[in-house]
Amino acid sequence: MLIAALESAFGTDNGLSQAPGFMESARFMQYMTAPGGDCFCFSDSPVEAECNMMMFWFAGKAKDLSLLWIERQYLDRPDMPFAEDRLLPSLMVFCSQLDLKNIGKPKKNFWFSRGDTPVFIYRGGWDSKEDTYLGVKGGSPSTSHAHMDAGSFIFERDGVRWAMDLGMQSYITLESKGVDLWNMSQNGQRWEVFRLSNIAHNTLTINGERHLVKSNAPITRTFESKKQKGAEVDLSSVFANSVKKVVRTVILDQKDHLEVTDRLETGDKEAAVSWIMVTPAEAKITGKNRMELTKDGQRMLLTVDADTEVEMKTWSNVPPHEYDFRNPGTIRVGFETVIPANRASQLKVRLIPLK
């Protein structure tokens, strides 16, 4: 709004819009919205998407109407909320300068942003709520508003969000109950909040310990072909107190089957590994290293391939504290295993649709 006001009053923003990454943030927001309509809600992001009238300014500034592909659909929904609805009159100003009859879909299906919080996105299409969607996150708990969610992922297929993030908990509900929310030290109370902890995210937990706050998990490789779509995240610093190395690869194969591969190397101590995925589906353990997920008439087979003994598990999402938000209609699924000392090991999980 400031830039729009400066341009209107003075004919220039004196270079503010050229700040590194600023114009790209519009495309970032677009990719963060999944086909099903919810956000890739890592860190302190809410789950629900909103119509953002600033996207119309970005579209005009960038001369790229494809930025409005999702927003145009929102305008057809009377139930859709607006972000900062007090600024809604600005929508008419921005739209008056655009030809809204010629909004085309985005041309790309991949997004990869580096920086302190690297994120990879694959969007199988832009036309259907049943399009496949994969989001992968690296980063650090030490960044602004972060959770212990390095290595986490979101996965949608056939209209179901099979792997989800519970999203943020509003600050007032925690601070009003005396939670020291902004103490981000390793032993800070922030990490006792269920939704902020690593045990409530689609990532690994080793020896029951928290992720290291002063760690950083870079996305070291991306895959952007028809045969493989996804990213590799180096989680070694996240677990530096427990193991020598952890590298996670999250990909979709040619059939859009999800594969999550974790390669670990232990030191002179064994490592008890918990593999966790949060889901809205119902789950049933159907055999050794196998589990079936069911949601909205769809079924998904979860299999584990490991060189150690695996115990398949489901966990309730009933949180441990009175101040935690409830999480109805969700559970955690996965497995536990122990990797011996001085061992290189691989854990591979596949999600395969069942007809």
Per-region residue spans from a language model:
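Catalytic-core segments of enzymes that bind and process phosphorylated/nucleotide-bearing substrates
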Residues: 156-158, 167-169, 290
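Carbohydrate-active enzyme catalytic cores, enriched for enzymes
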Residues: 1-163, 224-228, 232-234, 330, ...
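CBM-like, beta-strand-rich accessory domains located in the C-terminal region of large
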Residues: 45, 73-81, 85, 173-355
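Cytochrome P450 core scaffold surrounding the K-helix E-X-X-R motif
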Residues: 163-166, 171-175
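Active-site donor-binding loop signature of nucleotide-sugar glycosyltransferases
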Residues: 138, 166, 206
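Short, acidic Gly/Pro/Ser/Thr-rich loop/turn segments
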Residues: 129, 143, 171, 211-213
